[in-house]
Amino acid sequence: MGFRGVFILLSVSMITMYSCVLGRDTAKSGISEINFGSGGGVTGRVVMYRLRPNGTVYNDNNELVTKLTKKETAHLFGKLSKYADYSYDNPSNMSCFIVITSKRKENRIVWAVMGDPHIDSEVVELYERFMSKIDTK
């Protein structure tokens, strides 16, 4: 099973597991959560973090990793709300992804880790901004 298969399986599992605990949509953005992650390569390992509207960040084991400030959370939710319908699916051996979930749909944005010239640069900047807030030790 390739990265795409693992990613789809992981996404479906996460949605199923957390569907009962999803909070209300953020009033301004309409987004209920944002997942940021990367994976692939020889091992196929996928690392994912889930950002909730209250700023809490959980890893894929549902362990609390950190809590972002209200300002940072509002910035990420606000900026990423305009990408709720952005279509980009270009995985490679190693890929990054953002999954934007709202009441009405889920949108996956997937791009190559090693510089994808066609992805909207703001998406990559927002991904990097979020990941810089995570203590990955």
What function would you assign to each model-found segment?
Residues 46-48, 65, 108-109:
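Well-ordered beta-strand positions in beta-sheet-rich domains
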Residues 37-59:
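N-terminal secretory signal peptides
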Residues 55-62, 105-111:
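Short, well-ordered strand-loop elements centered on a beta-strand within folded domains, enriched
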Residues 20-39, 71-72, 83-137:
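Short, well-ordered, aromatic-rich surface patches in folded extracellular/luminal domains
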Residues 57-87:
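A short-motif feature that recognizes glycine-rich, charge-decorated loops
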Residues 1-20:
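Sec-dependent bacterial lipoprotein signal peptides
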